[in-house]
Design a protein with these regions (language model features):
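Acidic (Asp/Glu) and glycine-rich low-complexity loops/linkers
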Residues: 1-98, 104-116, 124-136, 151-153, ...
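Short, surface-exposed interaction patches in beta-rich subdomains
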Residues: 126-128, 132-134, 141-238
Length: 238
């Protein structure tokens, strides 16, 4: 197996990733007739896992176990799930779900983390340490990131989805467009800005300064005793 630093999963396979040194490995656990229908290959530093073209398949079990020294990208397109078995230590990484698949895994340590959902999938992770955190939920998916330590955080929700953050950050920028919710009342920021367009809600926690802008029926609730820059409506104390 050639070296790779990115993982791309298409369709319905479930993948577990283990970070370990040495040559990368890929193990497939399924029935023999399914193995021949899979398309697993490395191209442009990316391990692609999916099915061959024009294949319709049903199966009881399909698990792909992957190990590699480092990952800088994880992308799920479809209904497959990816689990980080023993955490992940890397520099910059982009994690994305498009469709109904899920990504889970704890203990992520990186420089910059860009993590996003487009569709109905979910992302769940705890114990994240990074410098720059970018969070995006577009669609009806849910993202839950617990015990995060970041320097700068930008989080946005567009649609009916939900993003839940806990932990701490020096500075945060929050935005909601649509009916979604951004719940960060347990995510302590020194400085924060919160913008709502539509009927969604933001709950946040700021210690030093909070800027709020709302349009529509949405609202912003806050914890802490920050200096406030806010309009006449749409802000309330938690």
């Amino acid at each position: 197996m050639d070296n790779f630093t990115k993982l791309s999963v298409a369709g319905s396979p479930d993948v577990t990733y283990t970070q370990k040194s040495g040559k990368p490995t890929v193990e497939v656990y399924t029935s023999d007739n399914i193995v021949d229908l899979l398309d697993i290959r490395v191209k442009d530093n990316t391990l692609y896992i999916g099915f061959k073209k024009n294949v319709s398949v049903s199966y009881n079990k399909l698990e792909v176990r992957v190990s590699a020294e480092k990952l800088n990208g994880i992308a799920v397109a479809g209904s497959g799930d990816v689990e980080l078995k023993n955490g992940l230590k890397t520099d910059d990484i982009k994690i994305s779900v498009a469709g109904s698949g899920d990504i889970s895994g704890n203990n992520i340590s990186c420089t910059d983390l860009d993590i996003s959902i487009a569709g109905s999938g979910d992302i769940n992770s705890s114990n994240i340490t990074c410098n720059d955190l970018q969070v995006s939920v577009a669609g009806s998916g849910d993202m839950k990131l617990n015990n995060v330590t970041a320097n700068f955080t930008r989080a946005s929700v567009a649609g009916s989805g939900t993003a839940i953050l806990s932990g701490s950050t020096q500075e945060a920028e929050y935005s909601v467009a649509g009916s979604g919710d951004l719940l960060a009342s347990d995510f302590v920021a020194k400085k924060a800005s919160a913008s709502v367009a539509g009927s969604g809600d933001i709950k946040c926690h700021a210690t030093d300064f909070l800027k709020v802008r709302t349009s529509g029926s949405g609202s912003v609730g806050y914890k802490g005793n920050p200096e406030l820059d806010y309009p006449k409506k749409g802000l309330y104390k938690l």
